[in-house]
């Protein structure tokens, strides 16, 4: 019966490289992997089953991930970073959608644990402020939480600096000459929505600009929410010269509503979004926004989780990634004599 050593000799690589290719425990170039797989096939080599290996080493090389179902492509862009990083590290990914349902979320977590995943990545807004008994029953399972908080269970956390991002957005509008600046927030029970709004308020306070309650509306981070929020602002009276819309999906809804109502973006109203989702540059006008490093969020989550799985660190970590401004065409400079 052929061995890994035989495959290594035929493929012209080391035995450890053969092991990594067969067990998918490390990224190996496509050319070398093809040579190894071809040699294994030629020698009729059969690898031990994944189940047998996992029972032997108490590892499945599988990560579970829970995501809140949303029409927002932000989640898909983050998952792409997670999936690609898992592949490069030789891990499989099991992805579960919670659809915002608390019971489904708990059921999915239990299912993933029963499948003996090595660790969990959670990106569920419904987890915020929750205490989950399942993590008390499985205290040793490594968990990384992405982009939400605070949590009532111990976990590492990867998040965007939303306070800084909200400040950047409002401060940019101010630097462009705007003094009447409204805000469409996300759901303010959510930490990230709170922080973006706080950043907006901090920028206005620093420059001594007033808050007009008629220009501040809470919405839901979805297109429809932005659409309805803008109509509420219009119904309350004169518009501000600029709006900070706290994510790009809501900004898309605002642009749609503005077009229906004959409000020209950006000449009648400047808009800045948040997230820099892929379609932001294809909106009309292309959306000025705050870039979240979405791929890097996913990558950092995998790297942090693997450190916990491999027991490289025991301390709970909070890793904060910094947002940046992306200038496009939905904001124009404002002059006091403009109407």
Region locations from a protein language model:
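N-terminal helix-turn-helix/winged-helix DNA-binding helices
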Residues: 1-2, 41-74, 78-80, 88-89, ...
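N-terminal helix-turn-helix DNA-binding module of bacterial transcription factors
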Residues: 1-59
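Short beta-strand elements in bilobed, periplasmic/extracellular small-molecule ligand-binding domains
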Residues: 86-97, 201-224
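Flexible loop/hinge segments that line or gate small-molecule binding clefts
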Residues: 92, 100, 122-168, 189, ...
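Periplasmic-binding protein-like
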Residues: 109, 116-124, 182-184, 237-247, ...
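Hydrophobic alpha-helical segments within soluble ligand-binding/sensing domains
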Residues: 158-183, 195-202, 223-232, 251, ...
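An alpha-beta-alpha
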Residues: 169-207, 214, 317-331
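Flexible loop/turn connectors
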Residues: 229-339
